[in-house]
Curated annotation (Swiss-Prot):
Lineage, broadest ranks: Archaea, Methanobacteriati, Methanobacteriota, Archaeoglobi, Archaeoglobales
Xref: Pfam families: PhoU_div
UniProt xrefs under PANTHER family: UPF0111 PROTEIN HI_1603
InterPro entries xref list: DUF47, PhoU-like_sf, Put_Phosphate_transp_reg
Protein name according to UniProt: UPF0111 protein AF_2149
Amino acid sequence: MIDRIKKIVFGGEREREVVELIGKQVELIIDTCELMKSIIERSDEAVVGDVCEAEKLGDAIRRDIVLKIHSGAFIPALRSDFCNLAEELDEILDELEDIAMLYLLIDFIPDELRDEFIRIADTNSKMAYLLLDAFNALEEGGLSDILLKIKILEEQIDSMKGRIYEKLKNIDFSGYAEWYYFIKFVEKLLNVSDLIEDAGDTIQVLSVSIR
């Protein structure tokens, strides 16, 4: 029965196109998270432009997804959830672009914080890979275990927040602008894991709806 329902949900041409496009969205998130790791680990400002291009491509994919859904892909009960997922994935790409742009405005990152930021960027990347696994699990199964792994990684980042903000108190910023850009950079870097977890929650809602 479950397999037959999934065939009805995912079997149409427009439905398959939307599924493939959402998969491309998540793959873009994976690629962009890897770029962010490179930016933070090696101060590789040259790839900031690649992050911006990924965001533009992601936005075009989101528009295409929404258009196909409103043109009749999926049964009405599922359309809003698929649209929500596309919007949430686009928000992750927006956040990653903001982080990359803010990095250009930061004069320096203390070594003790750079290590923390590298760890966060690496965890965000791992969560992005798991998000693709979670989306594929809508058809293949095993979603609960994947979402649990995402939750555990998100909690690891949450546990780092207090330590990071404590270290921030010891940094001597030259002025308000430098402080503001640095704080926004930290907030957004920490927020990526929350956004990925939110997208995972929407995938879970879709899984329940499909049943």
